[in-house]
């Protein structure tokens, strides 16, 4: 019997902050399971979840507005510790008898908080000291409204010059509120505060570790599918690869992986996937060469969205055909991860994340009545990678840069042709190889090459050439919501350009994309 790694858990109620998923990831990093729900939960749902503690997230709304989100009153009656962050502190203060007002000045950025009163939340935690020996904390503020009066049974723990109630606490009820964001790295002691709340105040054990997650997932897969056969679409990406390894550990040869080679992959990627998962790890893989079929379907199409839909449709068709060839397959496995689940969650109030339908594979034929196996659906991407390492997958594969689902189909601008894909594959491989050699690959968040459907005059030896143009793209970002173009060294860019033009016959010019996001997107299409 495996250990119950969900025994101690934190419930995070989401009021819409851009940092809310980061709060959840920080709690998981502390070895404690947590779930992220929309703020408008019911008492029955909270009782059923049985949390060891509750965190109220930040949010963009104003608590001074009549219809702004509020925590369910039961949150404060459940008898568990509650931690309000930014908006979460404001709604806690207002709902428990305090007062919140709009501020003429929005406080955004670095601030120093002076600790005035002892509290379990910050005891022994400091960045520096005042002249008279009081602890100071370096924190990150992001708020417009502020608490102007705390509930009568709370005490002021810390303040700033412009924020008199930066931390408030009711130690008896174990209610805490902070006006800053402990989850961001700019709040230097933020992880220690979260650890203090989760591990000490809520008394959660660190049960959520990669090894225990694997044991739990394997046990649950075996319980769910028994001796039945399972099919998985393996792309070679992180999510499907880790899903494949978990299933292989759980059910061995009862797993069949279908690898659809669509002709839109990186250089030698198909061979690498087959070598790694088939030859090295011994998985049962069906390799489906489908380049011609995909390129035929894409012929003549220039619109990026139409290309995405064509690639998705043809993939589903090919996968379905292969699935129908297999006998007695009763389960479809997908690499759905926790952010997909969060995005798919609908809220009656419309305050939750944008709702979208999530399908890794798409629809299966109606005649195939299959159950769904999603062993990663509780995990964030960083957790999936850690589990992949624990399962023996190579670091370079798990931590390589993001690659779009439609592959080179959206990195070849305009119509997709085999000639263009072949040129792009080789140029991109040179760029990535040089980034690794220069120890720059892990210093940028994403790097790739784009094929431009324009010809440019060049000179090669004594002759002129009229060949294609590619653009190099490299960005630095924390969350991929915004990004800066990477300031790569000129000599490095020159070396990459020379290699591509000299080694890839058919390319005469290399340019570098210096657009940020916004206004540009990271991918060109």
UniProtKB/Swiss-Prot annotation:
It catalyses: XMP + L-glutamine + ATP + H2O = GMP + L-glutamate + AMP + diphosphate + 2 H(+). The keyword Membrane does not apply. Its EC number is 6.3.5.2. It comes from the Bacteria. Keywords: ATP-binding, Glutamine amidotransferase, GMP biosynthesis, Ligase, Nucleotide-binding, Purine biosynthesis. One of its GO terms (cellular component) is cytosol. ATP binds at residues 235-241. Signal peptide: none annotated. It is an enzyme of class 6 (ligase). Residues 9-207 form the Glutamine amidotransferase type-1 domain. Pathway: Purine metabolism; GMP biosynthesis; GMP from XMP (L-Gln route): step 1/1. InterPro entries: Class_I_gatase-like, GATASE, GMP_synth_C, GMP_synth_GATase, GMP_synthase, GMPS_ATP_PPase_dom, NAD/GMP_synthase, Rossmann-like_a/b/a_fold. GO terms for biological process: GMP biosynthetic process. Residues 208-400 form the GMPS ATP-PPase domain. One of its GO terms (molecular function) is ATP binding. The active site is at residues 86, 181, 183. Homodimer. Catalyzes the synthesis of GMP from XMP. This is GMP synthase [glutamine-hydrolyzing]. The lineage of its organism: Bacteria, Pseudomonadati, Pseudomonadota, Gammaproteobacteria, Enterobacterales. The gene is guaA.
